[in-house]
Amino acid sequence: LYVMMPYSSKLKYVSDWYVQLWAESLGKHEDLQGNHIHVGPTPIKALGATDQHSQFQLFNEGPNDKIINFIRVENFDTTLDIPKIFEYTGIGYLGGKTMNDLMNAEADSTKVSLSDYARPTVTISLPKVDGYNVAQLLYMLEVQTAIAGELYNVDTYSQPGVEQSKNYTYALMGRAGYEDSAKTLQTKMASLASLGS
């Protein structure tokens, strides 16, 4: 399992994109020689700091079968100061700091917490979120995926599992040339319905 976790809401959709890229490029049932292998790491999207509270119990104490990839931002577009109005409450220590400081402290402390449980992590740091840096990030992740495909010995540029469901949809919707597939598909659907699926 491979977790992509940016600590910036502006990078939230990088995780969505990466999950799609990683799954369709590396989830294969045949290697380049045609051997049946059923391979591919499962990508998971997360957003820091939100998903620390929804997923990290599993990541820290569950099976050690995940790599967590953090994306940090060094310089945010805006700086939001935390006011000192809460001095006499349990969160008074935050007064005078920034939300940017808090976000990076969340990323760093979460990474250390994972290391306490011997969980592997990777951190990518972006100087800032702009077209130049995001383009470099996307390109690096594309190259990473291509290299992973070579290591898994699979064709990263095909997606037969996706094509199959597209063809089934064409058949169900009556696209010309898919009449035989429609008949076969109706039989399969009836069989699944009888099993209660």
List each language-model region with its residue ranges.
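A SIS-like phosphosugar-recognition module
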Residues: L1-S197
